[in-house]
């Protein structure tokens, strides 16, 4: 489903700028999320004002009743099913699944030369990245597995590293060593903007430098196969203030309505130049 969404969005590359591709991706998932939660009648106008109205009519059409809507809805349903399965969460929680995932990725993807580890890269950013790079003739591979983070916080990942007070840089070093990669980078752009502008989805989407998010991946992928991985994603929530972005414990609150429950899913993909 991620691959199909990427292919459909990249087909709009001729009429959308990179920023518009990002807005289109967020809008697709938000619209589908509102529809799935039966919140579209009450919240649809705000979505149009904040995001949809900034896109050309052909893009708006496929987001509201076309392929992007259908694909976004399918992805949301699949994620809801995974994270609502208590047995799955209990199986993963507290166990060092990074080692298993890295072994599986190595078997499935083969040689990986570079690693870009993102803090809080969520599904909208990963799909935007994949679509934009596909337009630029990069090959995108979505593996059959993903990293499940039951608490939606960095510490679930860092606690699996056998180092006292491990950091994300330690996680990056472990991944590079395990995969025998040449080099890698840690990109904190999305997490920084969640904590600075997450109080308002419109402000968040304006201030995330999607160019910076993609640039690190693109520079490595020009040289060789590059693994893209994140520690967790983020949720999109709604309360009296409007739509906002959060992850982890801050997302557990009875005063809001959950529109997108993405913080527990860490997207993974491999990128290389054709």
Locate the predicted segments by residue.
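Feature captures the catalytic ectodomains and active-site-proximal regions of enzymes
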Residues: 1-274
